């Protein structure tokens, strides 16, 4: 499948729109529906799409219900598959190639006025070094025609880059914009060990579409999804430059940092290409970051009790807070679930545990469970001096934070009839 195959329900905007704040302003004014902008003033011949990957639209796009989502991702993590390789002549992404790289000619947007400039936020980076392949999300500030500055969080790609720099090497990369959503989901997952995320994407592609995931090889040897709208390739250089400010998932401005510079040698795209122009801090951003955390949290909690579902909350920006539904079989299941959930997603700051009768996607019902089933002095865990998230502006100067868990389940030995809602 291809990214564009999932845009059938999009509203097409034919009026001239600027990539400098224009897409963001239009989307905000219309309550962020699924949109395709086909008349971008600065980049004629190129379109842009926003707001595809909300939770509901994503599940509809890949043909599953929200209730099936977590278990489907967990299945793919346990059953990785091997993509198939196709010749570049059969790869849609190679339908057009720029004579010389000009990233300024494609619709990389400047959404928020507070951002440093034009940012590619929905593109994934595929990198390979010393026999290890990694695919992950990292925002990129467009510095000039063939350079971006990438925010590398301290995970596998940053480790790969640091190792290469220590050895006097560079890291070959490919940047992929608008592949099929299953590729984006796999890229958004985080693993403790080095796992080839493209094998997770291949498993999802086979399970959901009954077709193998097709890759094609670039001139620098890297393999990328053949149906992607845009692909550009190059390397992580030894140079650093300023990156940020940037409106992040919390809706607050992230810091200015010295970050690695990417240099690009080639750029290809499909006929009539559609750039995925994710708006930072909105629902699509929170979906891509938060939903892939749910199966890791569920897996961690399932090791200590029966976990039924996990929801990354909107108020927690899809990243810093979750509600976990369990089926309680022992008196301490709620407390164990808190500890396991926080361990399963180390950036999370707050977790609430509820019983199986609570709709965890409804904040009113979760709050109802809190006020009717939770006693603050005995059902609360506070953990101090924990590793914090760089996305949390309240973290301490050394990067640590405290974390909290609420056990809003009915006491195990209580008469449950008095706790059940009749509404």
Question: What do the PLM-derived regions correspond to, one by one?
Answer:
Residues 1-246, 251-261, 265-423:
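Extended, highly charged
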